[in-house]
Amino acid sequence: MASKIIAGKPDDTEYEIIEGESESALAAGTSPWMNSSTLKLRHRIGRGPFGDVWLATHHQSTEDYDEHHEVAIKMLYPIKEDQRRVVVDKFEDLFSKCQGLENVCLLRGVSSINGKICVVMKFYEGSLGDKMARLKGGKLSLPDVLRYGVDLATGILELHSKGFLILNLKPSNFLLSDNDKAILGDVGIPYLLLSIPLPSSDMTERLGTPNYMAPEQWQPDVRGPMSFETDSWGFGCSIVEMLTGVQPWSGRSADEIYDLVVRKQEKLSIPSSIPPPLENLLRGCFMYDLRSRPSMTDILLVLKSLQNSEEEQVRRGIDSREIRKSSATLGYTEWFLSKDHLQVRDTVRSRKPANSCKHENMDVPEGMVVGLERDSTDPDGFVLVKVHGVHDPLRVHVSVLERVTNGLASGDWVRLKVRKDKRHSPVGVLHSIDREGNVAVGFIGLPTLWKGTSSQLQMAKVYSVGQFVKLKANVVIPRFKWMRKGRGIWATGRISQVLPNGCLEVDFPGMLPFGEEHGSYLADPAEVEIVNFNTCQGAVEKYQHLEDFHWAVRPLLIAMGLLTAMKLGICVRKKIGRSKDGKQRDGSTGQGDCKIPDGKGSDKSKWLVFF
């Protein structure tokens, strides 16, 4: 392919490459589309799941100047004709929104060469991965890690503010400028091509590099959604690699990494020699539930504090937050709680414990914030809440409260009032709701968060770990494979985990594990119903539900029944034996005895005892 493209270009002419970048092509209102005749491919410098990276020369010429610049071209693999316009529009939107971002690679424009869409960007001499490869041990010093980390977190935050996910964070995608500043080299191509059919049907390759992928990236439609905190995982992996010089999950295949990260939920080993605030930050980046990970704003705050030699101050802050987490935040991480800040006149209520279906202690059933004792952004602050029927405001720690807007709060189970797209589940989990009622919801079947308004939602039944569920009677073909009992009856399972999009992981303790059927199953919350002793009608159903708790219940009860029958039989036999012995000694006849002739005219009689 390369030789074919280069063979068709005109002969090279002598020119001088100008150092630096002309801003003329980046002026406001300038179209990002570049004429392919101004681009001359030189040689390929890289290859990835979406296409090849080429070193090229861009020729700009007007009446006032004639310039040539070295550029890097990301040439995408062929895209279907009916999707080309969609892709071009996405990249033009990206181009317009990324102008002026200091920590993101400079985009020059969009073009098409031999029918392939190309993203043209400034050429950088090397990457952070290249620099690490040249160092002894392949790792960076802590000051360098913090410095580069601040640069990169700033760039990621800039792209997040424009609504883009990166999904492919790794040292080889972190470019270095002439003044040794880390630049974000991937502008979120996996995210932009998420719904575009490509030659490769392997979703793993399309959504990032396995060694740096978050759990939800492997199956975003099922274990998603992907959100900004998905990039926190990849960023954490990159920081660990900078500190250790070892690639995450080095030497493992994609299938092995999937088994470790998604199924077994194992986390990367974090160096113990780093400052506690950084260690705590990295542990947060590797939380399985993306809602419990730090946002890029939190990451940038911690890195800047460490970089400015304020480690002791940060340590005190983090430690105090850990105490609050264990005593007052009901199982939520400090990163989860830091994503929303209370303001005066907010409606609030007590926060229910994590993985619980109901509030255990409603100190504040519902009230209004009337005062802030400290800065609202302080995770250890207190607020004054006015509760109906209570004269004086209550002084409550912010970590035990959640903001309520239009009757909804983050973490609530919701259902779409009108389901327009049948491909995704109508039941999901609310991830965020702002004060204007704009919502973001995770649904099975959608790789990213669904955006809408609270008026489109209604409350749904709550599911939590430990509950038993079964498929509804009207479900003929479930979304996911489900266990069956004998005679083809759907089995009842127990929820072992609730994923961020409402997908339920279910195991079947009432079924004896055998072969490939052993392990967890998945369920759509819209297709199941809760089973407990209150919902069971009659003794038979209650006994059947008792068997759902463990496969050993039935054999245990059978064994106990047999043992009881044996003991009863032995007792009866002994009693009969004692009764016979007594009758033979005294020759008396008790009630229920019948005298039967022996049939031979003898005076002797035989006694038959009925028992």
Curated annotation (Swiss-Prot):
Its EC number is 2.7.11.1. Residues 573-611 are chloroplast intermembrane. Keywords: ATP-binding, Chloroplast, Kinase, Membrane, Nucleotide-binding, Plastid, Plastid outer membrane, Serine/threonine-protein kinase, Transferase, Transmembrane, Transmembrane helix. PROSITE patterns: PROTEIN_KINASE_DOM. ATP binds at I45, G46, R47, G48, P49, F50, G51, D52, V53, K74. It is a single-pass membrane protein. Residues 595-606 have a biased composition (Basic and acidic residues). The keyword Membrane applies. Disruption phenotype: No visible phenotype under standard growth conditions. Impaired preprotein import efficiency. Reduced seedlings survival rates after transfer from the dark to the light, a process involving massive protein import during chloroplast biogenesis. Residues 1-555 are cytoplasmic. Residues 579-606 are annotated as: Disordered. It catalyses: L-seryl-[protein] + ATP = O-phospho-L-seryl-[protein] + ADP + H(+); L-threonyl-[protein] + ATP = O-phospho-L-threonyl-[protein] + ADP + H(+). The keyword Ribonucleoprotein does not apply. Residues 39-306 form the Protein kinase domain. The chain crosses the membrane at residues 556-572. One of its GO terms (cellular component) is plasma membrane. GO terms for biological process: de-etiolation; positive regulation of protein import into chloroplast stroma; protein targeting to chloroplast. It comes from the Eukaryota. Serine/threonine protein kinase acting as a regulatory component of the plastid protein import machinery by phosphorylating import receptors (e.g. the A-domain of TOC159, TOC120 and TOC132). Supports preprotein import and contributes to efficient chloroplast biogenesis, thus being required for survival during de-etiolation. Associates with the TOC complex containing, at least, translocons at the chloroplast envelope (e.g. TOCs and TICs such as TOC159, TOC75, TOC33 and TIC56). Belongs to the protein kinase superfamily. Ser/Thr protein kinase family. This is Protein KINASE OF THE OUTER CHLOROPLAST MEMBRANE 1. The lineage of its organism: Eukaryota, Viridiplantae, Streptophyta, Embryophyta, Tracheophyta.
